[in-house]
Amino acid sequence: FLNQVDTKIEQLTKKEKLLQQYKKGVMQKIFNQEIRFVSDDGSEFCEWEEKNGNEIFETISNKNHNSDLPILAISQEFGAIPRDMIDYKITVTEKSVSSYKVVSIGDFIISLRSFQGGIEYSSYKGICSPAYIILRPFIEINNDFFRLYFKMDRYIQQLNSKLEGIRDGKMISYKYFSEIKLPFPCIEEQTKIANFLSSIDTKIEQTQKQLEKTKEFKKALLQQMFV
């Protein structure tokens, strides 16, 4: 029976890896425009535009808060997330919190590690360290489209090319961000792309949960065997 559980773990691990590879491959084809989506009536969408970062996003530095908003941790794994939702042990003084910036749902955040892991997205309202650069769209966009694009290898490489010759840990400035061209399909195609890629993410998450449950089941089984 233990062999069957091991086989299930192997299968789920392989499935997750294949889904990740599929997502990566299909994203490359979508953003190279080898794959194009069509509108609901079957007609073709207009050609993609290219816009500089500052034609879509402005930088926000709102420190007008009374410090009762949750402090957000900015991580490559979770994006912007309240610190108390993850194991984040750094403490801050009330005085330092007063200088923190307000982050709204739908904001994007450039961190010290964006040259490694891209730009993070916030699904939460909170406050973050003034060291971070907060980006907010001032024209209509699909947030998920850019959330996914900003984590792509090709975009991270573009961020890196802007930092050539600058030491590790250098913050990407709004000026650097603004100089990079961003793909800009019409909003309807942005939404189609985001929905399609999000559906793959859902399958990946479901597989990861199944894998975790199966591993926990095996662990419990082994504990019972050796009691």
Model-found features: residue ranges?
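DNA target-recognition patches
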Residues: 57-94
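Residue "hotspots" at secondary-structure boundaries inside conserved domains
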Residues: 95-101
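Short, charged beta-turn/beta-strand-edge "cap" motif at the junction between a beta-strand
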Residues: 114-118
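Amphipathic alpha-helical coiled-coil/heptad-repeat segments
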Residues: 1-47, 183-227
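Short, surface-exposed loop/turn microsegments at beta-strand edges and helix-strand junctions
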Residues: 64-76, 101-102, 119-130, 137-141
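Non-catalytic DNA-recognition/assembly elements of restriction-modification systems
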Residues: 39-64
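A short glycine-rich beta-alpha junction/loop motif
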Residues: 112-113, 127-133, 166-188
